[in-house]
Amino acid sequence: MHAPPTATRRSGPRRTHGIMARLVRLAAGVLVVTLVIGALTALSADDAKTHPHKVCIHDELQQSLLDSVAQQGLAPQRVSRVGLPYVASATAAPAAQVGGVDFALAGDSAPDVTRSAEWGELRITVSAEELTDPAYHCATVGQVISNHIDDYVTCTADDIMTAEKLDILMNYLIPEALQMHKDRLQVQQVQGTWKVARMTSYCGRFKVPEEHFTTGLSNTDFVLYVASVPTSPGVLAWANTCQVFSNDQPAVGVINIPAATITERYDHLMVHAVTHEIAHSLGFSNAFFTNTGIGQFVTGVRGNPDTVPVINSPTVVAKAREHYGCDDVTYVELEDAGGSGTMGSHWKIRNAQDELMAGISGVAYYTSLTLSAFEDLGYYKANYSNAETMKWGKDVGCAFLTGKCVVDNVTQFPSMYCDKDENVYRCHTARLNLGSCEVTDYTFDLPDYLQYFTVPSVGGSADYYDYCPYIVRSPIGSCTQAASSASPFVSAFNTFSMASRCIDGTFTPKSTGGATVTAHLGMCTNVACNTADKTYSIQVYGNGAYIPCTPGATISLDTVSDAFEAGGNITCPPYLEVCQSNVKGAMDYESMTNSGSGSSRPAPVEPSGSGSGSSAATTAPSPTRDGSAAADRIAPRTAAVALLALAVAAACV
């Protein structure tokens, strides 16, 4: 994801100034920078905790588990072709001590389970006993606990599992994520009772109710054990499959959702991050792709001499042809960049940036691409009527998949890729952020197949995108950030909330937040979504009322708000681009129209384990909000942002 350390940003065109003016500005800038360095350190640290850049470490963890299982020396018939152990039998069996880990023996072959002949709801049991046991999660600052991977960590204030965070986790994040899968995937349900085998590696570090080993689980097709312990910087959550049924279908999984990443109830990024990780535990993984035969390697992709992982199964190919509008598709690329945590278990972000199973965080739509991969594994039946729509790559044709994104300095796909470094805000394609195009000039020439500009050392800033230039999200431009902590610069023309989305336009705010960069091509507006009629209204900066926004219509900003200069406007995007998966936007509409009584949210999950097979039970403890603590956190951030605004002003005059 990151540019090589030798890369330097290639600046776009700027106004010419006199030498004296430059010296004055430089002196002012040096003074401000001297003041701001300490504040920026605190600001960047706070941003990392509040809006971390998602890094997926799935494959790295999966390989660690596979290596651990292989080292146990289990009989071949007790290990699946995926390399994971089978669940224990549903009847009593002796136990063997293997390498310090108890495994329930299944006999001479994998334990069979009886399945329904019909397809039915995917029943997921959630066990979260760790969240009520202070020995397994951060209960006090300075406490030392296992991170469930390979180390012990010291708990900080951000790591504490407060009552509010527990409420968000158990009553919103997990139920919403589970429902995303249950609405779209069916299984041939397991009949009767089955038992979990005692586990090794990081799977064995999760707290499992003893009855899951002895009595077993019923009415359950998959059991998920939940932890909340600190993890590596930039990781929102991680999950994996631990055990499988006799047909290699995932049966047991684990997920860790660190308390430090739980901040807001309707956080779109976190809901989809949890959904993404649960998908890995359900089998969206290189290990399953390879061992079921749907994953392959090809060479020569867009001139790339290296082998590239792909899926070439029939349903995936058919759905890709529909999405991209290309009948020549014979495979869909998986990620070949990003290292061992990302390669092979995600769609290639160049081709599917906004998909649920792309390798970095984003809007993460659950599209027919991911559904078809699940279906072609053979374990699931997909409900394509509930597939979400992704604008990225939609009907762009074969050239997008086979050709270059930019040719002779000109983008071939302007809705996705750009070609000029710029100093203006516009909407990121996912509409959750403001951003700008970044073009980088490296100190070396890029390979021929990655050269898009007449200068061979120039390209985009990320290897994930094959160095295609794209709209990079601004670190201060999240539409869903708290308004109270937003910088003065972006606060001058945006509205922020969990329902806010970015809308394209051309306008100049009357207030510039201390900077002289005044013209913009996008703004964050609150969105209220009428899910019944597929219509929406928006609230722009400077106007407390919501106004209808008809897709394709242009709104003159000076007619609806006094905050903008005359002549500015915005253009209403399609309904799906601002309302699909916008849970808070739908709730805000219901609240405004007093029609919320009929709405239903997924049931909460109980923070304790049982073998009943139900993923919905009693609610978690009621949260208690600490307003004073929140104010204390905001105050230093606000000061840092104020100093940052001064630095921006000094640099932009």
Curated annotation (Swiss-Prot):
Pfam families: Peptidase_M8
Localization of this protein: Cell membrane
Disulfide bond residue pairs: 138-155, 203-242, 326-398, 405-468, 418-437, 427-502, 479-524, 529-579, 549-572
Names of the cofactor(s): Zn(2+)
Lipid attachment, kind GPI-anchor amidated serine: 628
Catalytic activity as recorded in UniProt: Preference for hydrophobic residues at P1 and P1' and basic residues at P2' and P3'. A model nonapeptide is cleaved at -Ala-Tyr-|-Leu-Lys-Lys-
Glycosylated residues, chain numbering: 383, 409, 569
Active site per the UniProt annotation: 277
Compositional bias annotation for Polar residues: 591-600
One example GO MF annotation: metalloendopeptidase activity
GO BP terms, alphabetized: cell adhesion; proteolysis
Keywords: Cell adhesion, Cell membrane, Disulfide bond, Glycoprotein, GPI-anchor, Hydrolase, Lipoprotein, Membrane, Metal-binding, Metalloprotease, Protease, Signal, Zinc, Zymogen
Task performed by this protein: Plays an integral role during the infection of macrophages in the mammalian host.
The protein's name in its UniProt record: Leishmanolysin homolog
Species this protein is from: Crithidia fasciculata
